[in-house]
Amino acid sequence: MGHLPRGTLGGRRLLPLLGLFVLLKIVTTFHVAVQDDNNIVVSLEASDIVSPASVYVVRVAGESKNYFFEFEEFNSTLPPPVVFKATYHGLYYIITLVVVNGNVVTKPSRSITVLTKPLPVTSVSIYDYKPSPETGVLFEIHYPEKYNVFSRVNISYWEGRDFRTMLYKDFFKGKTVFNHWLPGLCYSNITFQLVSEATFNKSTLVEYSGVSHEPKQHRTAPYPPRNISVRFVNLNKNNWEEPSGSFPEDSFIKPPQDSIGRDRRFHFPEETPETPPSNVSSGSPPSNVSSAWPDPNSTDYESTSQPFWWDSASAAPENEEDFVSALPADYDTETTLDRTEKPTADPFSAFPVQMTLSWLPPKPPTAFDGFNILIEREENFTDYLTVDEEAHEFVAELKEPGKYKLSVTTFSSSGACETRKSQSAKSLSFYISPTGEWIEELTEKPQHVSVHVLSSTTALMSWTSSQENYNSTIVSVVSLTCQKQKESQRLEKQYCTQVNSSKPVIENLVPGAQYQVVMYLRKGPLIGPPSDPVTFAIVPTGIKDLMLYPLGPTAVVLSWTRPILGVFRKYVVEMFYFNPTTMTSEWTTYYEIAATVSLTASVRIASLLPAWYYNFRVTMVTWGDPELSCCDSSTISFITAPVAPEITSVEYFNSLLYISWTYGDATTDLSHSRMLHWMVVAEGRKKIKKSVTRNVMTAILSLPPGDIYNLSVTACTERGSNTSLPRLVKLEPAPPKSLFAVNKTQTSVTLLWVEEGVADFFEVFCQQLGSGHNGKLQEPVAVSSHVVTISSLLPATAYNCSVTSFSHDTPSVPTFIAVSTMVTEVNPNVVVISVLAILSTLLIGLLLVTLVILRKKHLQMARECGAGTFVNFASLEREGKLPYSWRRSVFALLTLLPSCLWTDYLLAFYINPWSKNGLKKRKLTNPVQLDDFDSYIKDMAKDSDYKFSLQFEELKLIGLDIPHFAADLPLNRCKNRYTNILPYDFSRVRLVSMNEEEGADYINANYIPGYNSPQEYIATQGPLPETRNDFWKMVLQQKSHIIVMLTQCNEKRRVKCDHYWPFTEEPIAYGDITVEMVSEEEEEDWASRHFRINYADEAQDVMHFNYTAWPDHGVPPANAAESILQFVFTVRQQAAKSKGPMIIHCSAGVGRTGTFIALDRLLQHIRDHEFVDILGLVSEMRSYRMSMVQTEEQYIFIHQCVQLMWLRKKQQFCISDVIYENVSKS
């Protein structure tokens, strides 16, 4: 006997078994048996032997693999059997015998199928089937699961005297339910066997496991009795005799001798009353009493619950003493009982009361052996009686008043099982008054109970009921939130324990608390069942006095107070902001704070983004389920302060200070922050401020040299700022400029110079020329003015004089001048006249020779003078005006300088070389027919635009004598961007202001006449940070709906205009005016924005057109003429739809502004006329605001645009159809 796996039999002639079933010869038989220990025994019979030389092999199949066994070699006797230890119990195996004779394998003689026996059930549990314990049971069996196979379970038991058995397969996890047993019957000797089944060759094998568990027994519950009813009869006490019976003499119930008095029967309200038997007399029962005796064949049955009035805990589940079982002291029997008799002198004269209890047998086919009767009175006395199965009535006498409870149950006791009672039928509860009257049980609970919250402290209950035999209600209220709070932190006291009231209004509630209310109906001392509990909550009132205290750029402290009356679980602190990571704005919870008894609370919120807009909200969340919170209106908004910038570099050259700084780190987001701009401040003897847009972190300041400046950069938001650490910069003093020697005499000379920057004093030193070391040295003279007279000089002597500026004890580089004193004998007047004559002759000759050669250079110098080269020599006067002789000498010198300089010098000294009374207001004109315009342009452009230059020089003389006193007021000087671009008084725009101070109505702006109106335009400078509020005030007061901006805020590292509008769509207040950017559209060369400005209850829409491709002091490129004309036409189309003057500005409000106005007027003029007068147009504009069309280049550009307008008009006959159509930008 041995176990031979496949693939190991080649040496023993078993290799052919694996695949060589070639030759079929002999058919044999063999024997297979299965033992109890799960061994399969295979033995050979004598008839199986073919030849002793043959090999006999057994194949076992059934498990996951096949097993092969070879019989031992034998001669005369049969070999011992082959034994296979089966792994599985309850599994079928196929046994095959194979004979190998040489290399020939016979066909298997036959295959025998055997089935092993499954392992038995080890334990059994039997339970009631809770939905139906009368007919149903739950079986739970336990058995070995590993290697145990079965298909069904055989259940055997004795049903009374009958034996039952059945095969059952609906077991799930070892459990199944029987729901067809008989009620009240004893089932015994219950056993379970596992059954294995197999089908092979149309034959079925079945094996049963043994029974190893203890046999079980179980009795089903009997059904309860039906149609229980009770009758009451008041007995005449004088006629009553002591009957014989089993009741004690002092019992509170006694069996009656006869029935005298009124007969009353009480039924379950849900059951149908039965017809009384003929031998029972009935009185006149009330409406809920039936005279019918129950039908013995009735099968009506209803399972009911225990009464609610008897156990006071049902009315007061948390406090059993809340409801008193005894009759209340103020109980009035005349008003509370349905039927009442006047009490006699003896309150117990109506006793004893005879009670007759009747019932019907339980629903068939219930097996039962009798009935149990339970009589209770006020939990003090209990009688438990048993009657046999034939009894259907029980009579007793009640000797005392009180609350009674009756119940009748069925019991079953026959058989070997334990005695079992039925579930209790609905108990009968009633009250017997001292007068013998009875009150039936209240069985209905209040329906549709609801609570309506009237206020934060009161609520009103409502309900419905079909019963009308109750006279009051009980409202039981308990707080569900009180017990959730720690006693030390408890915020409510009133309803922490159950409180009962007879009023429907619930008072003294606390906001934020959650309550549960139960209602009972009450009649006399009887209390009905409780209603379904109703839960309601009072919304919290929310916090108040929410305050915010900033702690720097990234942290704030929120503090608030809670209402005195209120209960809640926690505070929830939320914040709303734009998240630059997710690019979304949403409310997020930052922190939760547990509720405390403290009236105040605070929280520190950190890790905020600097210069960011936040909304904070604090809500109170209740304990209830679901949670309630209040209130979303408890919010506060705040813009965090920016972080302090850090100045990284400061460089000074060419009289300009270059400052650079950094802000935050690489992750700092400026594009979505509330950063408005930077304020760069240089504070020395003069404080200089400059506003820089937030996207630029460099600034250029023109600082007077010679001073020590405290530099700082301030990051500004709408509500706060943060300043960098200061940086001290000391600028070396500059040498005096324009040093002149005037009013020379034989022994003295007067030196005159211009101060450059800041100087504490000047040191003047004169040394005689050619004296060598023996010359007399003059002592240095320290002066604080710009004029000094050096005396004690030698006549007719040459001196080298120097003037050095001193500032903060630091000297500048000296400025030198060579002077000579007058000769004693010579008349000074003759010398002066001679010198002037020689100088005049030389000057005239020089001008004639170099006029053509230096023309371009002269014009370039004029342009380089710019707006910032004006020097007011009037400041040189310290004590009155300069002497006339000085002024003449200065004039003679200044005529050598370019006209842009000396005209300002002359005006500064009030010197007019052309006229004693000055130039009057002039009107120039030069009309040109458009048909001749091309040839006119060619003629004007000859010799490097020489004739254009002559015309433009004449334009410079316009308006020199027009006053601008308002602009020169000290209060208004800071409102001017450039000191030499000032508005004329007669045409300036005056602001309406409640402030009557001088200069309150001033803004650097002038009315300019147009093609349609004498005040069609307002030309103004680009707003300064100090004047942006006045700018918006002008827009609102002038009812302007169009603003044209012809500059960028920063050009060539210089600030040209303040960013006077909001960066984002968030409204910003400029003084009393709020500006909101509704929309913004970007084109290739310009941007258009829609603003809405609000003041009080007034709103005004404004369109803002910003042309960004126009260089300062210049003109757009030649190929951009189409673009600028398209822009002008776009603005004109919008202007046609609105009223009020158009506001036009660039930086100074004269160059690009004048060019735009000229093009807009000419565009309208050419549409209706065949000539133009550009010279007259510019002359007229300059008579309303100085320097309109500021450069000659701009003046020529206007002519080029007119040439293009006329060309398009000639080509298309309608200029607007072609040149101004909206073309897409590539």
From Swiss-Prot:
Modification sites for Phosphoserine: S875
Location(s), subcellular: Membrane
Active-site feature positions: C1146 (phosphocysteine intermediate)
Full protein name: Receptor-type tyrosine-protein phosphatase O
Similarity section: Belongs to the protein-tyrosine phosphatase family. Receptor class 3 subfamily.
Primary location class: membrane
Cited function: Possesses tyrosine phosphatase activity. Plays a role in regulating the glomerular pressure/filtration rate relationship through an effect on podocyte structure and function.
Protein EC: 3.1.3.48
Glycosylation sites: N75, N154, N227, N279, N471, N500, N710, N743, N800
Span list, region Disordered: 242-305
Residues where substrate binds: D1112, C1146, S1147, A1148, G1149, V1150, G1151, R1152, Q1190
Signal peptide bounds: 1-29
Top-level EC class as recorded in UniProt: hydrolase
Domain Tyrosine-protein phosphatase: 948-1205
Composition-biased stretches (Low complexity): 277-291
Gene that produces this protein: Ptpro
Gene deletion effect: Modification of podocyte structure such that the normal octopoid podocyte is simplified to a more amoeboid structure and that the foot processes are shorter and broader than normal. These changes are associated with altered distribution of the podocyte intermediate cytoskeletal protein vimentin/VIM. Mutant animals have a reduced glomerular filtration rate and reduced glomerular nephrin (NPHS1) content. However, there is no evidence of proteinuria. After removal of one or more kidneys, Ptpro-null animals have higher blood pressure than does their wild-type littermates.
Extracellular side: 30-832
GO terms for MF: cadherin binding; protein homodimerization activity; protein tyrosine phosphatase activity; Wnt-protein binding
Record topology, Cytoplasmic segments: 854-1226
InterPro entries membership: FN3_dom (IPR003961), FN3_sf (IPR036116), Ig-like_fold (IPR013783), Prot-tyrosine_phosphatase-like (IPR029021), PTP_cat (IPR000242), PTPRO (IPR042996), Tyr_Pase_AS (IPR016130), Tyr_Pase_cat (IPR003595)
Record CDD domains: FN3, R-PTPc-O
Topology versus the membrane: Single-pass type I membrane protein
